[in-house]
Amino acid sequence: MYTEINEMLTPKVLKVQAESPYKARIVLEPLERGFGHTLGNALRRILLSSMPGSAITEASIDGVLHEYSTIEGVQEDVVDLLLNLKSVAIKLTVGNEAQITLNKEGPCQVTAGDIQLTHGQEIINPELVIANLNEKGKLNMTLKVERGIGFHNTDAFVRYHDDEIEKKTVGKLKIDNSFSPVKKVAYFVDSARVENRTDLDKLTIELETNGTIDAEEAIRISASILQRQLHAFVDMKFEESRADNKERNDFDPVLLRSVDDLELTVRSANCLKAENIHYIGDLVQRTESELLKTPNLGKKSLTEIKDVLASRSLSLGMKLENWPPASLGE
């Protein structure tokens, strides 16, 4: 079985064609037929839904109690402000949570670059427009940035954190957001050829990130996530082996050894093998009378066997429960 698995083709060529720092095309070939879609679909789903990243998840705005408010002198209403904050590509390099602020007075255009950062944050798209202020406009915000995986759903937060809802301070606006740094993913499967084989796959993955990580790093992380999730299946044989070892440990290790290790005379050894006695554990369960019924095994051979067993603190006629172990001979 393992020989057949080892004979399967594994990819020999991995090409990364960068169209920009955050957009790339990754080509993997050759793959056995069908593996292009198997791997492509799995990686695409992970890239879109399960990648770790950072996002703004909460905003406190001076003078605003809920998201259906408006702010004097600000062109955008609060809902639009929150939507714009969702588009801020921010990278946390230290810790899993941080607070940042934004304080601006009009007339001006407020961009992501106006956000005042503390230690360990980086904004990738500082040109992103958040709001437009006129002469009377004033915008003071405190923003919460968190690291996470996949999509941050405020409805789920409310549903599963009822005890915290009571503690929630009025004016803290929760923001639905995606932590995933991947914006777009698509994969294509084409035919590939190796020598005379033409039934192989070539997998091409096109992806674009928000800039907090590059495309090559994104594909590497997604492959690592898939590998970790499949590790339990790979380890099944190891767990089975540990169970076998436990079973074997119930017996004296000497009993699991071959009768050849007793170094009997050729005559005695051949007689035992003719009776399908291959392990010392098989031998010690036989009685003297049973062995004497063995063709060509006389009293001299019997005495030899008894003496050799006695030198190992063993004897004939022993009772061994659950013998033989299921894993014996593997």
Swiss-Prot record:
UniProt-annotated stretches for the region Alpha C-terminal domain (alpha-CTD): 251-330
Region: Alpha N-terminal domain (alpha-NTD), residue numbers: 1-237
Catalysed reaction equations from the record: RNA(n) + a ribonucleoside 5'-triphosphate = RNA(n+1) + diphosphate
Signal sequence region: none
SUPFAM superfamilies hit by this protein: C-terminal domain of RNA polymerase alpha subunit, Insert subdomain of RNA polymerase alpha subunit, RBP11-like subunits of RNA polymerase
EC numbers, comma separated: 2.7.7.6
GO BP: any one term: DNA-templated transcription
Molecular function, one GO term: DNA-directed RNA polymerase activity
Listed GO CC annotations: cytoplasm; DNA-directed RNA polymerase complex
CDD domains, A to Z: RNAP_alpha_NTD (cd06928)
Sorted UniProt keywords: DNA-directed RNA polymerase, Nucleotidyltransferase, Transcription, Transferase
InterPro entries according to UniProt: DNA-dir_RNA_pol_insert, DNA-dir_RNA_pol_RpoA/D/Rpb3, DNA-dir_RpoA, RBP11-like, RNAP_asu_C, RNApol_insert_sf
Major enzyme class: transferase
Domain of life: Bacteria
Quaternary organization: Homodimer. The RNAP catalytic core consists of 2 alpha, 1 beta, 1 beta' and 1 omega subunit. When a sigma factor is associated with the core the holoenzyme is formed, which can initiate transcription.
Free-text comment on this protein's domains from its UniProt entry: The N-terminal domain is essential for RNAP assembly and basal transcription, whereas the C-terminal domain is involved in interaction with transcriptional regulators and with upstream promoter elements.
Its job: DNA-dependent RNA polymerase catalyzes the transcription of DNA into RNA using the four ribonucleoside triphosphates as substrates.
Similarity section: Belongs to the RNA polymerase alpha chain family.
Protein name: DNA-directed RNA polymerase subunit alpha
Lineage: Bacteria, Pseudomonadati, Pseudomonadota, Gammaproteobacteria, Legionellales
